[in-house]
Design a protein with these regions (language model features):
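Bacterial N-terminal signal peptides
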Residues: 41-53
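Boundary at the C-terminal end of the N-terminal hydrophobic targeting segment
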Residues: 55-59
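Twin-arginine (Tat) signal peptide motif
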Residues: 33-42
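Extreme N-terminal basic, low-complexity initiation segments
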Residues: 2-11
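Cell-envelope and extracellular/periplasmic
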Residues: 60-304
Length: 304
């Protein structure tokens, strides 16, 4: 049986002025021995044990003892990776899916997964992880490493960029506990200009190669998704929005770097702004990412 994430219980104080704590206060003197004092002593002992348990209980969710059983996935890109979907009110996180939170602690994968902006919401990472968990042995837990930041260009994710460094720092923490199994990427809206779009494919391929070199894994599976097909053709200032060109550039990735796959966005809807996928679309998108990841992993698995 897989252990359920632990929950920390907080106890509200009963008095505005705290009583002396017999567990920690050296000045506390025991009462004369009597039935009443014996009962008080028993209650005090139970209180001490409770306080000790609360004090030593970790805020971090339980993780597998073997790194091989903790499959990690790095989530990078901009807002459509971070997620802007409406968060369901009745969340029931998968018992074998965790996220590395903003405090760099493992926690149940409730949404929002990301914390880049207050508007972070439902994301494709949730259904991706649930699909991967369903296909994995019961001993395996999926660990998500959310690093996406809305509104960011590819340049900030390239080698030695600020977001490159932040993602690698969080990845290093996560890899102390598990094994990286793949990287998920969704970005390009910020690069859909006449100056940036034509070189997007080459720059993305270079970023993937540099990232793999940095993490010492030249065949790490990398899955990228298309931008939404609902994006407007021109920006409010009248300049063309070259999202179609970005998608064409993304399509060149598998021919430029090995062990890469592309996920289409056809048929997926937006949340009303013609920019961000809605929750239903993100759920489907995440499943598509998982299917692409599984194909890459199967293709790169050693022959038996």
């Amino acid at each position: 049986m897989v252990p359920q994430p632990s929950r920390i219980v907080s106890i509200a104080p009963l008095h505005a002025t705290p009583w002396p704590n017999p567990c920690t206060d050296p000045t506390h003197k025991p009462m004369h021995v009597s039935l009443r004092s014996s009962l008080l002593s028993l209650a005090t002992s139970l209180l001490c044990l409770t306080q000790l348990g609360l004090a030593t209980a970790s805020a971090q969710a339980p993780i597998p003892t073997r790194k091989e059983d903790f499959h990690l996935y790095l989530l990078i890109g901009q807002s459509n990776m971070a997620g802007r979907g409406a968060v369901p009110p009745d969340q029931k996180p998968h018992p074998r899916v965790l996220k590395l939170d903003k405090e760099n602690k493992w926690a149940p994968a409730t949404e929002p997964l990301h914390f880049d902006k207050p508007i972070a919401g439902a994301a494709l990472g949730t259904s991706f992880a649930e699909t991967m968990a369903a296909a994995a042995p019961e001993s395996v837990t999926i660990g998500l490493i959310p690093c996406a930041v809305g509104g960011t260009p590819l340049s900030r994710w390239e080698k030695d960029g600020d977001l490159w460094k932040q993602a690698l720092a969080r990845l290093e923490i996560a890899r102390q506990h598990g094994t990286l199994k793949g990287i998920l990427w969704h970005q390009g809206e910020a690069d859909s200009t006449s100056t940036l779009a034509p070189t997007y494919g080459k720059r993305l391929a270079a970023m993937v190669s540099d990232l793999r070199t940095q993490i010492l894994s030249p065949t790490m599976p990398f899955v990228a998704g298309h931008l939404g097909t609902f994006i407007v053709e021109s920006n409010p200032n009248g300049t063309p929005n070259l999202w179609r060109k970005i998608n064409d550039e993304i399509d060149t990735l598998p021919s430029n770097v090995p062990h890469a796959a592309i996920v289409p966005s056809e048929g997926l809807g937006h949340k009303g702004d013609r920019l961000h996928f809605d929750t239903a679309a993100l759920r489907e998108f995440g499943k598509r990412y998982a299917e692409a990841m599984q194909r890459l992993q199967k293709a790169s698995a050693p022959a038996r």
